[in-house]
Amino acid sequence: MKKGIHPEMKLVTVKCACGAEHTFYTTVDNIRIDVCSNCHPFYTSGGKGGVLIVDTEGRVEKFRRKYGDNY
């Protein structure tokens, strides 16, 4: 490996919108996420199986207003 060209890795706390915090090694200083394994329906649904939709930006509602619920 060439010296002096690689970014410095550091331990960073990643903060989720649900309040959970995870620690990772990364080159980025600050990371904020919308969904993590503590709040994502895939991990929290308890194996119910249905359709899981995570919509934090209102895209599903915009689609339903435009095309209706029967699409």
From Swiss-Prot:
Function: Binds the 23S rRNA.
Organism for this UniProt entry: Thermotoga maritima (strain ATCC 43589 / DSM 3109 / JCM 10099 / NBRC 100826 / MSB8)
Protein name listed in UniProt: Large ribosomal subunit protein bL31
GO biological process, one term: translation
Cofactor note as given: Binds 1 zinc ion per subunit.
Known cofactor(s): Zn(2+)
Positions with a binding annotation for Zn(2+): C16, C18, C36, C39
Assembly description: Part of the 50S ribosomal subunit.
Family, per entry: Belongs to the bacterial ribosomal protein bL31 family. Type A subfamily.
InterPro entries in the record: Ribosomal_bL28/bL31-like_sf, Ribosomal_bL31, Ribosomal_bL31_A, Ribosomal_bL31_sf
Record-linked PROSITE patterns: RIBOSOMAL_L31
GO cellular component: ribonucleoprotein complex; ribosome
Pfam families recorded: Ribosomal_L31
Top-rank lineage group of the source organism: Bacteria
Keywords: Metal-binding, Ribonucleoprotein, Ribosomal protein, RNA-binding, rRNA-binding, Zinc
GO molecular function, one term: rRNA binding
